[in-house]
């Protein structure tokens, strides 16, 4: 059943989206429109405003991107939270924070706990402890008895050196506030530390020396490495109660070994074991969850046991893909706001949809994969602008060309220039890049 905000039998609800990342905000208008919401967007992303204008002027795009009542554009990113405090939040039935940066800014804002609770996807101050903090999350999960990898907190350089010296098993070293896999490093006891290995992964000593050169901000999280599949169990909660969820396995990632997923294998909820739903309900209470949660865990190869290691208190770009298996978040969210219904398990099989399906995210594929319809990508681009996809492909190719040009300059031009002339060229390049980033037509970043 598809629910729409213009259904005469239902009153529309109102939602406010707040965030810096246009990529993460993009999926919400369509999802919330189907759930019966009229949407306002408060953002510093100029591209969202540009796309919103194009949606309003194009009936096909408007239908595909849902109903956005207004976009409130903030010129300076640092003013986003301040702007949200000047809005009448009582007019909204749902407030959605779109990205980790906005979550951290709200947490750091000099406002009352009550105001933070009005904005953040938690229902009690207990939830503040883990927002934007990998260490805080590990401690909360441990205290609640939720299965999570063993961990220790590294508070200074001395403790970091001691960790490496006494290493007896592979450890994941994580910067406390980081995302996208960029702050995650493997310390593997199987490496010699000399870099001479069949794998590209450097040894523990090399990793530590590299990190010390980056002016690390302590504390760090040292976490047991679990071998197995990465599962996504992203869910929507209200007052700690599970409203809807999805179940998928990472099949491919981008940027780095621990980066965001580009291809996933989704399964109908009817195929999911009851212990997974029990885990999700326990997580809702442990996290004080009151909104979208991006939940990730490891399924250990040897035992099949699940270990939760990530719970970002915002949705991911995959938030609306469960609909391709009949597990539509929009239907469940509308049902909750109309009747208070939560997710009941076990979930009945939906014969109108496949039990499993492989789904890619178009903006994390290469242009060649998109052009050749790898993983049937065009089937899952119903809500995407073809012009936008073409622009992404052009930006991807241009970035690759620039990378080769930079390498050529470093190898073949720099040796022939005086240091002062080389620095002048670099300064000119930075000035051009900064100017381009300030223009309204800022490039889309992967």
How would you describe each model-predicted region?
Residues 181, 254-255, 312-326:
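Glycine-rich phosphate/pyrophosphate-binding beta-alpha loops
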Residues 194-257, 267, 271-278, 298-299, ...:
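Phosphate-binding site of ATP-dependent enzymes
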Residues 331-446:
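Peripheral (often C-terminal) accessory segments that flank ATP-dependent C-N-forming ligase machineries
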Residues 284-320:
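Conserved metal-phosphate-binding beta-hairpin within the catalytic cores
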Residues 13-16, 171:
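Conserved hydrophobic helix-helix packing surfaces used for dimerization/oligomerization
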Residues 141, 164-186, 214-228, 245-249:
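ATP-grasp fold ATP-binding core
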Residues 40:
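Conserved beta-strand positions in the Rossmann-like core of class I SAM-dependent methyltransferases
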Residues 51-155:
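Conserved N-proximal alpha/beta basic substrate-recognition cap immediately N-terminal to
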